[in-house]
Amino acid sequence: RLRAGHLWVYSNEIDVAATPLHGFAAGDQAILEAAGGKPLGIVAMSPNNLICARLLSRDVKHVLDKSLLVHRLNVALSLRERLFDKPFYRLVYGESDLLPGLVVDRFGDYFVVQIANPGMERVRDAIVEALVQVFKPQAVLFKNDSGARKLEGLDSYVEDAYGVMPETV
């Protein structure tokens, strides 16, 4: 399925005899291999969910870190600038921008970030650092209070991650 363009791997597609899912913690990055051992990409693991892996990169040399986040944010920015005259839009659409579980809304110099899975939660500081490097924002707010987080075993919270978000934007 991954070779056909899918970005998720279901737990029933994993040979758990060869690679037991319980050996991974939620949010671990791993190299996904085909049955013959050919690397298919880097994935973020959610071993206790039906969707047990989400593709981060087809190149096994590119783990999800600040450098890859900066690159993906720049690509997303380039695409949005073609569509919008003003900087008020959804900058990151999760899997559509190859950042599964991440949504970033831009309101001029203010950014609201939603994280929906453990893989993105693990790199939350790098997400903020990448946003600061690319955009030099006034403020970044984490609005992580969706019900989907509970399904992933994540706590809900809303907090300023960088700067101070005004009451209204």
Can you annotate each of these PLM segments?
Residues 51-52, 61-62, 110-111, 131-134, ...:
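Short, low-complexity, polar/charged sequence segments that are solvent-exposed and flexible
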Residues 44, 116, 145:
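Surface loops and adjacent helix of pleckstrin homology
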Residues 49-51, 120-123:
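A short local loop/turn or secondary-structure capping micro-motif enriched for an aromatic residue
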Residues 1-107, 166-167:
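Non-catalytic accessory regions of SAM-dependent methyltransferases
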Residues 94-105, 121-169:
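Non-catalytic substrate-recognition/targeting regions of SAM-dependent transferases
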Residues 108-121:
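A short interface-forming secondary-structure element
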